């Protein structure tokens, strides 16, 4: 009987020991799980997401006022991918001062551009041969027009402007008067300066206000910041808001504004031309030898897009 009791005791001890070992294993496993759960995740610095690049070519025309929308004005819109569209454009050949001589053959459409070329006739007093292109249609506010332009790299004004055609009684908006290569050594900012302005003339009484926006002040991420007018195409435009307010644009960004002293209300034509004059405010007279250089003597217009505001 004593042996039976001893055997039973040993058996009970073995069972208790096994149970304790099993419980210990389970406890250790649970402790390990708890410890692993308690471990902080690796504190990795999340990769910085690069800011989305701004496509400045999509920012114009500007956002319309509430309840309004932009519609294209087809008569003042042209990609210049075909031939010179005589339904939309013509060549008024009135001259500026000597030495300018406007000629029809010095402008046209080719290779996807409207072009205006300055050439030399050294036998004449008016030796600066050039041209002008003007819209047949007119436009009034509220409107927006813009044109993508690469300038001739000569000392001359490459212009994109609006005018009603009467010098003594006129409204005029000069979107650009660009000169990327002034000869006078007196206009160091001209290769980047727009020279935007307005004129309001009544019976030869002139009111004027100008803005000299410089493309070196465009946003840092704008790919055309600091690029000279002759080095790349730039998109220049104007938002003629109302009878007083005129906002200029450059490469998708606001580029200065002017406020008219008098109501600015006349219907205006769109014009491009290329001309020179021996004055410092233009940048000095063109160098004759530059007019014989086919790589720099031509102003190129890739396209023009024009819009009117209407109620939705």
Task: Label each region the model flagged.
Residues 15-17:
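C-terminal motif of bacterial Sec signal peptides marking the signal peptidase cleavage site
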Residues 9, 26-27:
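Enrichment for repetitive, rod-forming helical segments
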Residues 40-312:
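GH16 jelly-roll
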Residues 6-13:
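Sec-dependent N-terminal signal peptides
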Residues 7, 34, 204:
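Alpha-helical and His/Cys-centered functional microenvironments
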Residues 19-26:
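Bacterial lipoprotein signal-peptidase II cleavage site
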Residues 30-41:
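N-terminal, intrinsically disordered, polar/charged segments of Gram-positive cell-envelope systems
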Residues 1-4:
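Positively charged n-region of N-terminal signal peptides that target proteins for export
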